[in-house]
Design a protein with these regions (language model features):
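Active-site-adjacent beta-strand/loop module that shapes the phosphate/pyrophosphate-binding cleft
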Residues: 28-36, 118-138
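Acidic, metal-coordinating catalytic segment for phosphate/diphosphate chemistry
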Residues: 15-51, 57
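Nudix hydrolase/Nudix homology domain
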Residues: 2-8, 74, 111, 119-122, ...
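Conserved Nudix-box catalytic region and its N-terminal flanking loop in Nudix hydrolases
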Residues: 8, 41-46, 51-96, 138, ...
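Short, solvent-exposed loop/turn elements at beta->coil junctions and helix N-caps
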Residues: 15-18, 113-118
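Conserved hydrophobic/aromatic beta-strand scaffold that supports enzyme active sites
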Residues: 27-31, 53, 63, 128-130, ...
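A short coil-to-beta-strand element that immediately follows conserved catalytic motifs
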Residues: 12, 105-112
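Extreme N-terminal tail/first-helix region
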Residues: 1-21
Length: 192
C-alpha cells in the first residue's frame, strides 16, 4: 500500500442550494452525481478555523474554559478562532487568537495537524499549531459573549492527555491537538 492518506474526489455537482444563511456558517444542500445515480446531502458550510496548543517552558498547556451552547457545557479548549479574515493564512489567525484570547505571543510556531471536525455533516477544517516560547502581552481586545467570563489555566501536558484519555475532556480540537503535541514532544525527546 502507498502512503496512507485521504483521497480528494471531485464529483459533478448537479445543484447546490443555500438552505440557511447564518452569522458564522451556512447550511447547503448539494446534489451530486455518484456512481450510476445522484445523491443529495445537506451540510454546514463552514469557514474553517485555526487552533493553538500553547506550551510553556514547564510543559504546561494553556487552556480556556468557556460556555458552548450546543452542548450546554463549559468545556475546556485550546485557543482557537474562525478563518474569518479574508486572505489571512491559518498561522496568522492562530497567532491573532492566542493574543486575543489569552494575551500571549510565541517565539516558535509549528504546524501540528489539519483536521476535518465532522466530515459527515460539515466541511470545516481546523489547522492546529504548536506554539512555544510564550510571553505575556498587553492587549486592548474586548472579550464579549462566551469569552467575557472565559477561564484561563495552565495545566501540565501529561494531565491534559490523561483527561482526554479518561473521557473527562471531550472537546475534539483540544483532544486531537494535545495528543499530536504530546507525540511531537515525545519524538523530539527521543532524538536528543
Amino acid at each position: 500500500m502507498e502512503e496512507l492518506r485521504d483521497e480528494r474526489v471531485n464529483l459533478e455537482v448537479v445543484s447546490s442550494d443555500l438552505v440557511y444563511e447564518g452569522a458564522v456558517w451556512d447550511v447547503r444542500s448539494d446534489t451530486v452525481r455518484y456512481g450510476d445515480g445522484e445523491m443529495t446531502r445537506q451540510y454546514v458550510d463552514h469557514p474553517g478555523a485555526a487552533a493553538v496548543v500553547a506550551i510553556d517552558d514547564d510543559e504546561r498547556v494553556v487552556l480556556i474554559q468557556q460556555y458552548r451552547h450546543p452542548i450546554k457545557e463549559r468545556d475546556w479548549e485550546i485557543p482557537a478562532g474562525l478563518l474569518d479574515v479574508t486572505g489571512e493564512p491559518p498561522l496568522e489567525t492562530a497567532k491573532r487568537e492566542l493574543t486575543e484570547e489569552v494575551d500571549l505571543e510565541a517565539d516558535r510556531w509549528q504546524h501540528l495537524i489539519s483536521m476535518h471536525t465532522t466530515p459527515g455533516g460539515n466541511d470545516e477544517i481546523v489547522h492546529v499549531f504548536l506554539a512555544r516560547g510564550l510571553r505575556t502581552v498587553e492587549t486592548d481586545y474586548e472579550r464579549e459573549h462566551e469569552e467575557s467570563d472565559m477561564r484561563v489555566e495552565r495545566v501540565l501536558l501529561a494531565d491534559v492527555v490523561d483527561g482526554v484519555l479518561a473521557g473527562r475532556l471531550r472537546n475534539g480540537i483540544l483532544a486531537t491537538g494535545v495528543l499530536a503535541a504530546a507525540e511531537v514532544l515525545r519524538r523530539e525527546a527521543a532524538t536528543h
